[in-house]
């Protein structure tokens, strides 16, 4: 019966056209949302990055399931004594993918690295002029200001020159936004007058070749037979089956209609763990679910109002109802597993009566209306944003606010929040590179406004600490600076940290060597299916 179910599923997904295809190794991943595109430099959402992950490589990459950086398209690199010059030696013989309209005429080389980064650095770059877009990660980390130039000193050698020391530079280059694109493909698209195809018909060097994408349905890839690390390609076909409903994803996993899924409902975990055909991979969450107060919208431009909102949040009730056994109360602006976390910081005591007094002192009138934005999708840091929003609505209604819950499709939600349309929003983050700057700089700095700083909070004292910490290479000194920054942020309350969730990843017992990423990535290189 299980064989018949798998057969019908493969037929439905178009993975079989004739009998011999039964021998093919296929894996279906029940994903949680539709990506906006595949040009990773444009996006910060894990949904977008997951969809692009099979297609691309970067100069350096994180080891599967870990945080260590290892060579990828660069086989080695050197750093100058002053920490300002990084010389990368590129891998020889790496092939780009092709598609129906493009066949590469050469292997990967330094020109591709220059195109990838100069497009983000140069506002007048020809491709950027033809296809204007934003680069939120690149800008929020200040790389647009700190990378002075990128040069090639040979066909397989590239030098990055920085304006100031960046202790996280190598880790940053392992992130999705730094995926290497084909300069030749970009030239082809410009000549054809179709530059936006770089986002919808992606070409990379990665272990899987993009085939096609149907929004709200599926993404199809095939194994890259020319991959430079052939041992990492153990699947003939990879399919993302898009299902926003977590209960549907689990049902499909039970029926073997998919072999890997994500973000299960806490209530489903006991039965999944009891099923001998399934397994649940578990890892402490390197994540944070939080409430962002738009400090440019009155009355949240006033500290005492933000303090009042913060102390009126019943975190324990939220943890029990929303996260159940898979969540821990968050106190700080990053998870406790992140080095430099300040254990001395404590939450304000839950005190609705004191919150009312603060609001009265601030002159906030009873009946003041506000919008509370709730994510439409389940995220690793928030399994049920709708329920959390309803609980916050009840908490803040007791203070006299009229709270209206707002939601949009996930891509639209992020876009509108970056424009600052919200009063208060539910959002979160899963760490990308293991460095504190990926939290304290990427999410809360002045440079991150318009990208990942959804509080629109810009504090010069805080910013000075974070920037200084990034320019110091001694970890003890960096820790001291980052702890001062955490204390300043806690005092100013641009956010209310709510919870860190344990990552639970249900997969079929037939799946081999799938590794849960601390950064929330779903990486299918090296994965096989019995």
What is each model feature region?
Residues 208, 294, 300, 329-362, ...:
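Structural transition elements
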Residues 30-82, 118, 125, 203-205:
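N-terminal lobe/hinge region of extracytoplasmic solute-binding protein
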């Amino acid at each position: 019966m299980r064989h018949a179910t798998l057969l019908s599923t493969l037929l439905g997904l178009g993975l079989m056209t004739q009998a011999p295809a039964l021998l093919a190794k296929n894996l279906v991943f029940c994903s949680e949302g539709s990506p906006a595109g595949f040009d990773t430099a444009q996006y910060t959402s894990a949904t977008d990055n997951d969809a692009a992950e099979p297609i691309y490589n970067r100069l350096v990459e994180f080891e599967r399931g870990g945080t260590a950086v290892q060579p990828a398209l660069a086989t080695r690199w050197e750093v100058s004594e002053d920490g300002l010059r990084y010389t990368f030696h590129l891998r020889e013989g790496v092939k780009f993918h092709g598609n129906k309209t493009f066949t590469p005429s050469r292997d990967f080389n330094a020109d591709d690295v220059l195109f990838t980064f100069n497009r983000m650095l140069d506002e007048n770059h020809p491709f950027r002029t033809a296809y204007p877009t934003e680069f939120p990660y690149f800008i929020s980390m200040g790389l647009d200001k700190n990378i002075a130039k990128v040069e090639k000193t040979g066909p397989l050698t590239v030098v990055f020159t920085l304006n100031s020391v960046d202790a996280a530079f190598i880790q940053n280059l392992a992130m999705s936004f730094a995926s290497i694109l084909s300069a030749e493909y970009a030239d082809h698209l410009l000549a054809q007058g179709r530059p936006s195809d770089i986002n919808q018909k992606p070409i990379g060097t990665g272990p899987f070749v993009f085939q096609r994408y149907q929004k709200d349905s599926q993404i199809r890839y095939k194994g890259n037979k020319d991959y430079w690390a052939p041992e990492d390609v153990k699947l003939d076909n990879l399919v993302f089956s898009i299902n926003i409903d977590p209960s549907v994803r689990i049902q499909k996993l039970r029926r073997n209609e998919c072999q890997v899924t994500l973000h299960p409902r806490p209530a489903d975990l006991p039965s999944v763990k009891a099923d001998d055909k399934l397994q649940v991979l578990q890892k402490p969450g390197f994540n944070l679910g939080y409430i962002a107060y738009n400090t440019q919208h009155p009355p949240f431009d006033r500290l005492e109002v933000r303090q009042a909102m913060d102390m009126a949040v019943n975190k324990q009730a939220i943890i029990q109802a929303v996260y159940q056994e898979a969540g821990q109360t968050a106190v700080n602006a990053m998870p406790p597993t992140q080095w430099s976390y300040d254990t001395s910081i404590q939450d304000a005591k839950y005190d609705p009566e004191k919150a009312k007094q603060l609001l009265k002192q601030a002159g906030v009138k009873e009946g003041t209306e506000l919008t509370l934005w709730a994510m439409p999708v389940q995220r690793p840091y928030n399994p049920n944003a709708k329920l959390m929003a309803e609980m916050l609505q009840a908490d803040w209604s007791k203070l006299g606010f009229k709270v209206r819950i707002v939601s949009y499709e996930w891509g639209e939600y992020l876009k509108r929040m970056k424009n600052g349309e919200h009063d208060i929003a539910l959002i979160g983050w899963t760490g990308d590179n293991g460095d504190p700057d990926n939290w304290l700089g990427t999410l809360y700095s002045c440079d991150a406004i318009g990208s990942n700083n959804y509080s629109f909070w810009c504090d010069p004292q805080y910013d000075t600490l974070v920037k200084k910490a990034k320019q110091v290479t001694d970890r003890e000194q960096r820790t001291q600076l980052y702890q001062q920054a955490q204390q300043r942020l806690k005092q100013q309350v641009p956010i209310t940290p709510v919870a860190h969730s344990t990552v639970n990843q249900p997969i079929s017992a037939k799946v081999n060597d799938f590794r849960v990423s601390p950064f929330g990535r779903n990486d299918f290189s090296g994965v096989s299916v019995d």
